[in-house]
Amino acid sequence: MTDTTRKDMVGCYGNKKMFTPNLDALAQEGIRYENAYTCQPVCGPARSAIFTGTFPHSNGMVTNGVPLGANVKTIGQRLTDNGIKCGYIGKWHLDGGDYFGLGCCPEGWDADYWYDMKCYLNELSENERVCSRQPNESFQPDFSEEFTYAHRCSDRAIRFLDQYKEEDFFLTVSYDEPHGPSLCPAPYNTMYRGFKFEPSAKFTDDLKNKPLMQQLWAGDKLT
């Protein structure tokens, strides 16, 4: 799972200017959805639907910053109850409060592999934490792939797969990238220099005929 990735940001959906060979391979060898729509445009509630199979208005997570309902089970809990090893590595955003998470593994997931964004920040020095949350200034030579959250999530995922390859397992790898601040090491930080997406009519929509809540999420002021 990636964060804030539009359909036109991957090659398998027709944008040949995007170089995404691994995602394209997943689409070729797995399932590529042509008519899939999120039930909620906000991160936390959308994730709550994916991992519980229930609508946000049913599971209690109607906006960011609030936790799932206390009696709501995730897919990790249900599969663990049936003897399947479950791992969750990456951004969680379902425990309420801080965007980065609480650093605590919820019920139903392997605590040895739990690695939300709070866990990542705990590994960094004070200066590194500042760097990790700034807009991309990553042209300096000491900025490495190993520094990024995505790289560290991937390393843990590989270890999980190696450990449980002979067992029934369910693994979620949830990258915060390409969500801002969009840190990107070389050589990827120059691959799309000068590239611009085609403008969308939705970008200039003033939303005056849309529900008030939609206007609020877009930053409009109440009158």
Residue ranges and their predicted role:
Residues T2-T4, T20, T38, T52, ...:
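Ser/Thr-centric signal marking residues that sit
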Residues M1-I31, Q40, T80, A186:
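Active-site-proximal N-terminal segment of extracellular/periplasmic enzymes that hydrolyze or transfer
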Residues I31-E34, N82-K85, E166-F170:
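Loop/turn elements at helix/coil->beta-strand transitions in domains of secreted/extracellular proteins
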Residues T4-K17, D116-D155, R159-T223:
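Active-site-proximal cap/lid insertion segments
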Residues C12-K17, G30-T52, P67-L68, Y88-Y99, ...:
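Short, solvent-exposed turn/loop segments enriched in Gly/Ser/Thr/Pro and often Arg
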Residues V10, Y33-A36, M61, L68, ...:
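Short clusters of hydrophobic/aromatic residues that line enzyme substrate/ligand-binding pockets
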Residues A49-E146, R193:
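Catalytic-site neighborhoods of secreted/periplasmic enzymes
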Residues N22, N71, I75, C153-F160:
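Alpha-helical packing segments of well-folded alpha/beta enzyme cores
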